[in-house]
């Protein structure tokens, strides 16, 4: 079967869709009606030229065909040719903008009097050298371009000195693509806060920011998993925006996308796990031990390359890293809230005001350790300091409608004075409302609702209803309002219950004062003789009988 013939304009369009559009081979093939094999063939041919896409894009069809489709390969003689410095070439290719074409030209210029290899043989020698390295080392990462991050599998124990409880610390690993310069730290877990906090610490350790960050596909950072374009959650996007970088998660189950991170994790597991037999009583102590091991790791010489991680970092990545922002990223969380009718939202037990026009609408809340920001339509509409007490209110006057601003000007004394002008019973209810509501704002509203009844019913009726409410011991505005609605304030107050009838005066009836006399409790034998009762009881002595000193009746003489 004859090979598929492709017009040069389609080849050029194929390369544009690949290098500018970033489309997959399958999508390009479908768009241009080509096979995936043909697309791969020309993309590979373009890569083999050593030229970047902008250089290929300016070529006409004839020049592009000459670059991509050489009609014959010139055989090279096996004379004494100068062998290029392959280790230096491998290192230099990590610099941004450096290509094999440029390095070949420099190689030829450096040996003007000696026979050198043609470009194709130059590339062939380098590829043979690169094939002796590990696969992950063959990937070309530009200096300062990518930072790979991941978590190591094993965890380390941390003992609580107070309770003896053991928690497991997770090891975060970050490695720069060009130099393999590595950072690691221990975190309490692998939550969103842990990922983003550790990433900020890694940037601080490197002293700069890479162009891209390549994480795995952690749930803590991914909102919408996808094989080709996984969607980051809002916190991860904000973190990337703060550091002026791009976060590009690797594809699920595609370890080759983050081979640098996989290798770094393996190195860290073998190097830092030397502390696994030590006991640590805080995360800080564990991170101090990890920091010491990191210095040794980054200064250890490479096995197949010259130098060490630190030397390569100082030579390649460090000069081209982007500057750090003035302040590190403060990790935030987002939640969706609905504004209550009183133009407040509830966040973790606290109540925060928003513009009153947003009542009953949904807003986004950006919650940090110290602030609460409210967003509507991606625009910040309110900002509050975070409340530390549950049930507390944070209300800003500019969020209140005009009528509520007037209400806010009321003070407890002003409300009490208004109630006093209506009547003492009304003032008593106002005072009760101010002191028995859980929040002062609630007390103000209740008092204003009570006092506003005077406009509808008049001061006299309000005071009468307040008097009846006080008598009923129902000191609240609802009771007063119901009394006014039913007209009960215009009925006379019920008379207080009359006390029970007192017994008639009698010489044997003693009052309360009698039992407080000290003489009743005096054991002095000079106590006066008791007076015989004038009336005989059922079993008592008869009338006219005298009593002896002991109080006993004397025998009657007949």
Swiss-Prot record:
Biological source species: Pseudomonas fluorescens
DNA-binding feature ranges: 23-44
Alphabetical list of PANTHER family matching this protein: TRANSPOSASE RV3428C-RELATED
GO biological processes: DNA integration; DNA recombination; transposition
Superkingdom of the source species: Bacteria
Gene3D superfamilies: Ribonuclease H-like superfamily/Ribonuclease H
Cited InterPro entries: HTH_IS408/IS1162_type, Integrase_cat-core, IstA-like_C, RNaseH-like_sf, RNaseH_sf
Keyword DNA-binding belongs to the record: yes
Protein name listed in UniProt: Putative transposase for insertion sequence IS1162
HTH IS408-type domain residues: 11-93
Family named by the database record: Belongs to the transposase IS21/IS408/IS1162 family.
Pfam family, one: Mu-transpos_C_2
